[in-house]
Amino acid sequence: MSEADGLRQRRPLRPQVVTDDGQVPEVKEGSSFSGRVFRMTFLMLAVSLAIPLLGAMMLLESPIDPQSFSFKEPPFMFGVLHPNTKLRQAERLFENQLSGPESIVNIGDVLFTGTADGRVVKLENGEIETIARFGSGPCKTRDDEPTCGRPLGIRAGPNGTLFVVDAYKGLFEVNPQKRSVKLLLSSETPIEGKKMSFVNDLTVTRDGRKIYFTDSSSKWQRRDYLLLVMEATDDGRLLEYDTVTKEVKVLLDQLQFPNGVQLSPEEDFVLVAETTMARIRRVYVSGLMKGGADMFVENMPGFPDNIRPSSSGGYWVAAATIRANPGFSMLDFLSDKPFIKRMIFKMFSQETVMKFVPRYSLVLEVSDSGAFRRSLHDPDGQVVTYVSEAHEHDGYLYLGSFRSPFICRLSLQSI
C-alpha cells in the first residue's frame, strides 16, 4: 500500500447530500422525528383550542328549539317531474326596479304586487306607481320590517278593490283608483288568545264576503322565516274573516308554516300549503264535509309557497327549494337532527345559511285531484330565482319572488 493510498483511507467521511437523482439523505430519521414532533404539537394545539371553543358554543343560546321529525323519501324526479329548463324561457320585467314582489294579481291587464320596501304598486305600460303603504320608513334592513310593513298575498275583490295581507300589519282593503286604504283586521288583534306574528297569504270568495288567510306563526315573524322552517314550529293557523260581521274564526291550527292558500272553483274547500312539511292540506268550508280536513298533496318534490288557479281547472304551486331525488336535500337531512340545527344557528346567521340553499326554482301544475300534471324548472336559478308564486293571466305565467328584484313572465304557449 502506498502512502497516498493510506492517506485516502484515513480521510474523514463527508455528510451525504441530496442530489438531483433523488438520493435519500442520511438525516432521514432525524427529519421524520422532527415532522412527528411538529404534527403532534399542532394536534395538541388544535385540541387545546377546540375544546374551549366547543365548550363556549355549548354555552351559547340557540335562537331555535328544533323539533325532530322525518320525511318520507322524496318522489323520484322522472316523468312529469323530470328536471328541465322551461322556466329559463321566461323574461324578466322591471329588473332592479322592484324588491321581492312576492304575490301578483291583475285587474284587467293591470298588474299589482307588494314589495319588500312596504309598498303596494301598480304595474302598467312599463311604469311602476305606488298606490298604498301600510307602514312607515325607513325600509332598508330586516330590522326595519316590522315598522315598514311587508305586503305579501294580494287578491282582487269583486268591486275593483284589492285585498292585501301585510306580514306585520294585518288584513287590508285597498282602492287602487282612490289610493285609499282600509284596515280590516289588525295583526295586534288576538285570535282565540293568540297573536298573529306572520300574516302570509289570502284567498277571497267571489262575492267578497269571506276571506281565508294564513298566519304562519304566532312566535316567528316573516324576517325569521328560515328559523320557522328549521324549528318546525307547529303554531300556524288557517283563519276565516267575514267582511260583513267582522268575525274571525280559526279553521285549522297546529300547522307547520302554513303559507299559500287557494279556494276551489266551487268554493267548497280551501287548499293551504304547509311549507315545512312539503305538503298541501284541504279544508272544507261549505257543503256536507264542512269542518273537515284531509291531505290534498303529500310528500311534494319541493317546499310549497303560494297556490293559484290554473286555466285547466287545477292549480299552480311555486317552490323556491326542492327535495331532489336523486340528489341531496339539506332540509330533509336535518329534519331529525335537532342538535345539528341548534349548532348551525349558534354559529351562522340566516343570511349565511341561505347562501348554502340551492337556487333551484320549481313550479308545479297540480290537477283538481292533487296529481302532478307538469313541472317547470330552472335548476340553478339562471333566470327565475326564489320563486314564490305563479299567477296565470292571458296566456302567461307571472312569477313572483320573495327576494328577487324583478318579476318574470313566461308564455305558456312556448312550453
UniProtKB/Swiss-Prot annotation:
Instruction: Pull one GO CC term from this UniProt entry.
Output: membrane
Localization, UniProt: Membrane
> What does the UniProt PTM comment say about this protein?
Glycosylated in vitro.
- Which keywords does this chain's UniProt record carry? Acetylation, Glycoprotein, Membrane, Phosphoprotein, Signal-anchor, Transmembrane, Transmembrane helix
The residues exposed to the Extracellular compartment are 61-415
Quick one: where's region Disordered?
1-29
The UniProt entry's coiled-coil ranges are none
Q: In which tissues is it expressed?
A: Strongly expressed in adipose tissue. Highly expressed in liver, heart, and kidney. Expressed at intermediate level in brain and lung. Weakly expressed in spleen, skeletal muscle and testis.
Sites carrying a glycan are 159
Q: Give the sites modified to N-acetylserine.
A: 2
Chain positions with Phosphothreonine modification: 19
Question: What is the recorded membrane topology of this protein?
Answer: Single-pass type II membrane protein
Q: What's a Gene Ontology MF term here? A: arylesterase activity
Q: Which residues lie on this side of the membrane: Cytoplasmic?
A: 2-39
Q: Where are the transmembrane segments?
A: 40-60
Q: Which superkingdom does the taxonomy of this entry point to?
A: Eukaryota
Matching InterPro entries: 6-blade_b-propeller_TolB-like, Strictosidine_synth_cons-reg
- What protein family does this chain belong to? Belongs to the strictosidine synthase family.
Its job: Exhibits strong arylesterase activity with beta-naphthyl acetate and phenyl acetate. May play a role in adipocyte differentiation.
Q: What is this protein called?
A: Adipocyte plasma membrane-associated protein
Q: Where does this protein come from, organism-wise? A: Mus musculus (Mouse)
Print the organism lineage: Eukaryota, Metazoa, Chordata, Craniata, Vertebrata
Gene name of the record: Apmap
